[in-house]
């Protein structure tokens, strides 16, 4: 598939990019070999996205050279890059959902028979690509009917159809099950066998060690190092990424659980399949983890408690008082807060500033007697969120979408703390966040527990649950399979419980 006359398929050398007042990239290098999977790592804000935008012509670089197959290139669009053999599978998949799979692959370059589209050839060509990549999807079904992992496979097949030499994958496993991740890795390895160079961007260290051959690390817009992965360990990579040694992945636990403040008894959601007969207690100052396989209905628990999912039976008691929580507004007034899993779609208002995003859950607090909003109080509370959550931002007016994932998440947590909750529920709070920012969010969570908040954390990352929680509620197929003390349990025990009702 790929002509191997060059040591590197892609050579980005000394690439710099400046924005007004900010040097986003400062002489960055990225060299990708054929037959290799190359990890590109760095904290959010390290410059990974900016570097790739310079490659695809979305940003114009200020200096540096880009060689592709030995020739200097300056792509002016993603389309030009794709047609030349450089493809990107995005975290947010850009597909025409109401069109068929094969339409999405051949869009804009349909095979023709006379004046008409040759659907038979399009079908045959799609089937041939799928067979080569071991993809089992009907080319004629609508993309809207596919799972996220299948949509990603369609994107990879599209890159393959363009005879891509470089395939860039941005956080490809963020929404996949373990089985789907395993299948994706098989397909990525097939691309490697055929001579492609795959650039793999992920915050998941385990994946980097499982699949990658080389690694390039960026920090604060600068190139730190490029090395073979063999011989490196996790601590060395983290130290290069953050510029200091993180001696522990998790802060020291200094919270002390006290009296029970929340009792959940026989909680069952109205619209099944969902949670059934779930019971647990939560103490003041306690961090309770919720574990389970994908599809175990972990999120349904916090949604039902928060009133966004209707319950058919069960009791929620806070300090012994029965809580109805018929909707989110009532739940907020009763002292509950929920940081949702999908930060981009249900957490932030991307085209609005930090002030709006920090205060939106608490607007009534800023109304004066005349019904106007108090600018002074709004400024003061926004500053409180920025200071107490340690948000890195130029100003209150900065659009939240321009912040790194870790800083966006801190603003969301700060937003809910302004409502003065007693129970804070966090669904996948560190998904898509780099290792340094994760540590800061763990610190914030522990500080809140020390202030006697009751905290519930849902996470798919087992080390996270074992590193930060006091107890873990394990869900299996919508039912509580057991509650374990974190200090006394193991990954194997949790996985056994998670399979109990399958």
UniProtKB/Swiss-Prot annotation:
Disulfide bonds: none
Gene3D superfamilies tied to this protein: P-loop containing nucleotide triphosphate hydrolases
Top-rank EC class of the record's enzyme: translocase
Transmembrane regions listed in the UniProt entry: none
Compartment(s) of residence: Cell inner membrane
Catalytic activity: D-galactose(out) + ATP + H2O = D-galactose(in) + ADP + phosphate + H(+); methyl beta-D-galactoside(out) + ATP + H2O = methyl beta-D-galactoside(in) + ADP + phosphate + H(+)
Gene Ontology CC annotation, any one: plasma membrane
Superkingdom: Bacteria
Pfam family, one: ABC_tran
Keyword Cell inner membrane: yes
InterPro entries cross-referenced by the UniProt entry: AAA+_ATPase (IPR003593), ABC_carbohydrate_import_ATPase (IPR050107), ABC_transporter-like_ATP-bd (IPR003439), ABC_transporter-like_CS (IPR017871), P-loop_NTPase (IPR027417)
Subunit structure as annotated in this protein's UniProt entry: The complex is composed of one ATP-binding protein (MglA), two transmembrane proteins (MglC) and a solute-binding protein (MglB).
Protein name, entry field: Galactose/methyl galactoside import ATP-binding protein MglA
Species of provenance: Vibrio vulnificus (strain CMCP6)
Gene that this polypeptide is encoded by: mglA
């Amino acid at each position: 598939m790929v002509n191997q006359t060059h040591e590197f398929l892609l050579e980005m050398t000394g690439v710099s990019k400046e924005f007004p007042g900010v040097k986003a990239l400062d002489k960055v290098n990225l060299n990708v070999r054929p037959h290799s999977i190359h990890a590109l790592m760095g904290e959010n804000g390290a410059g990974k996205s900016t570097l790739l935008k310079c490659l695809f012509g979305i940003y114009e670089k200020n200096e540096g050279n880009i060689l592709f197959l030995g020739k200097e290139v300056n792509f002016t669009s993603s389309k030009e890059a794709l047609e030349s053999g450089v493809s990107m599978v995005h975290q947010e998949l850009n597909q025409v959902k109401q069109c068929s799979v094969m339409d999405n692959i051949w869009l804009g370059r349909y095979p023709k028979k006379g004046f008409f589209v040759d659907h038979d050839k399009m079908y045959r060509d799609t089937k041939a690509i799928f067979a080569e990549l071991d993809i089992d999807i009907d080319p004629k079904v609508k993309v809207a009917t596919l799972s996220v992992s299948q949509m990603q496979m369609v994107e990879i097949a599209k890159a393959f159809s363009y005879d891509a030499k470089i395939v860039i994958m941005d956080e490809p496993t963020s929404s996949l099950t373990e089985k789907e991740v395993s299948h994706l890795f098989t397909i990525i390895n097939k691309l490697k066998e055929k001579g492609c160079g795959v650039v793999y961007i992920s915050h998941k260290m385990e994946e980097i060690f499982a699949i990658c051959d080389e690694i390039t690390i960026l920090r604060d817009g600068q190139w730190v190092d490029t090395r073979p992965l063999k011989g490196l360990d996790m601590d060395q990579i983290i130290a290069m990424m953050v510029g200091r040694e993180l001696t522990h992945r998790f802060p020291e636990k200094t919270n002390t659980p006290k009296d029970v403040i929340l009792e959940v008894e026989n909680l069952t959601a109205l619209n099944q399949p969902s949670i059934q007969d779930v019971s647990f207690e939560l103490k003041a100052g306690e961090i309770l983890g919720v574990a389970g396989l994908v599809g175990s209905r972990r999120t349904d628990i916090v949604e039902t408690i928060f009133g966004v999912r209707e319950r058919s039976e069960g009791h929620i008691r806070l300090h012994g008082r029965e809580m109805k929580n018929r909707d989110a507004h009532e739940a907020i007034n009763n002292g509950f807060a929920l940081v949702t899993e999908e930060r981009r779609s249900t957490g932030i208002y991307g085209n609005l500033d930090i002030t709006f995003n920090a205060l939106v859950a608490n607007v009534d607090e800023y109304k004066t007697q005349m019904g106007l909003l108090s600018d002074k109080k709004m400024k003061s509370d926004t500053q409180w969120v920025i200071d107490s959550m340690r948000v890195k931002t130029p100003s209150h007016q900065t659009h939240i979408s321009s912040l790194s994932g870790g800083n966006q998440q801190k603003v969301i947590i700060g937003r809910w703390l302004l409502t003065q909750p007693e129970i804070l529920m966090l669904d996948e709070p560190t998904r898509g966040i780099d290792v340094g920012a994760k540590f800061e969010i763990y610190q914030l969570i522990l500080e809140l527990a020390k202030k006697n908040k009751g905290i519930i954390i849902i996470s798919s990352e087992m080390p996270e649950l074992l590193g930060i929680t006091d107890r873990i509620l394990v869900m299996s197929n919508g039912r509580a399979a057991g509650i374990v003390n974190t200090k006394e349990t193991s990954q194997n025990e949790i996985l056994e419980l998670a399979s109990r009702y399958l």
